[in-house]
Amino acid sequence: MDCLDKIVQLKKMGKKIGFTCSTFELGPHSGHDVMLMECKQNCDFLIVGLLTDPTISRPEKNKPVQSTFERWIQITSNKYVDMVIPFDTECDLEDMLKIIMPDVRFCGEEYKGKTHTGSNIEGIKIFYNKRNHSFSS
């Protein structure tokens, strides 16, 4: 069963599909774990989009030190994560959101009130992760 078939099956079962994304560089560390735990507490099935290299869409960002495969291994082994889907660009992210149509998308609270990739897609509830800790994220 491929990723999309699995998601369709879960939706038919009435499961709440959640989605979050990040580069997850040098992690997952404690900040990532707290964020992923909060995501999983608010959905039945958590999909994580793994940004391969943020410099592709945003040259001002830092290139990851770890390979995509290293980061994929770390994220797939996290107990709160049910599926990991790598993506390359913000355009890929928007397409992925339109295809998956998760019930809830998790974003950091620093995005509240701001336009961000996929924020214009109707039908996806946005949940803003709290940053009420001092861990890096």
Sequence positions of predicted segments:
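Nucleotidyltransferase catalytic core that binds NTPs
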Residues: 1-137
